[in-house]
C-alpha cells in the first residue's frame, strides 16, 4: 500500500499494481472480474450488482464507469432506494515510470471500524495482485 487517507467517514487507500490499466479495469467493473477477488459471487441485473460473501449479500448500483480510469458504485440498502455510501476505484498511470496505481475510496458508516476496513482492503487488494500476477 502506498498511501492512506482517513477523512471523516471516508477511507482512501492507494496501491501500486504492476499491470496495465486494461487488465486491472476488467477486474473492477465486471461480475466475473469482481468475483475473482472481491466477493464469492457477483450477479448483475441492469446496473445493479449483487455481491455475495459467506451468507452476506449487498447490492450496489454502478453509477459511473470510465474505461481504464474509474469505477464508481453506490451501496444500496435492502429496498435498493437509498445510498449507504460509495465505493470508488480509480486507476492512474505514472507518466515517468509507467507504474499503475489503484486508489480505493470507500465511505463507511459511523459504526464501522476504520482500521478493520483498511485491513480488509489490504487483504482484498493482495488477492487481486496475486490473481493478476502483480
Give the ranges of each region predicted by the language model.
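Hydrophobic-ligand binding "helix-grip"
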Residues: 52-97, 105-109
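A short, polar/proline- and glycine-enriched secondary-structure boundary/capping micro-motif
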Residues: 36, 82-86, 111-117
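Hydrophobic ligand-binding cavity/cleft-lining segments
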Residues: 1-43
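A conserved amphipathic terminal alpha-helix motif
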Residues: 107-134
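Hydrophobic pocket/interface hotspot
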Residues: 24-28, 34, 49, 62, ...
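Short, charged low-complexity linear motifs
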Residues: 10-11, 22-23, 100-108, 133
Amino acid at each position: 500500500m502506498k498511501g492512506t487517507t482517513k477523512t471523516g467517514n471516508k477511507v482512501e487507500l492507494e496501491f501500486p499494481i504492476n499491470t496495465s490499466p486494461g487488465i486491472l479495469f476488467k477486474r473492477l467493473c465486471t461480475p466475473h472480474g469482481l468475483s475473482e477477488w472481491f466477493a464469492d459471487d457477483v450477479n448483475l441485473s441492469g446496473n445493479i450488482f449483487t455481491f455475495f460473501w459467506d451468507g452476506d449479500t449487498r447490492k450496489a448500483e454502478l453509477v459511473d464507469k470510465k474505461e481504464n480510469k474509474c469505477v464508481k458504485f453506490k451501496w444500496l440498502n435492502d429496498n435498493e432506494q437509498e445510498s449507504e455510501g460509495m465505493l470508488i476505484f480509480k486507476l492512474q498511470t505514472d507518466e515517468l515510470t509507467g507504474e499503475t496505481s489503484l486508489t480505493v475510496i470507500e465511505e463507511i458508516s459511523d459504526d464501522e471500524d476504520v482500521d478493520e476496513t483498511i485491513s480488509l482492503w489490504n487483504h482484498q487488494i493482495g488477492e487481486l495482485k496475486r490473481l493478476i500476477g502483480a
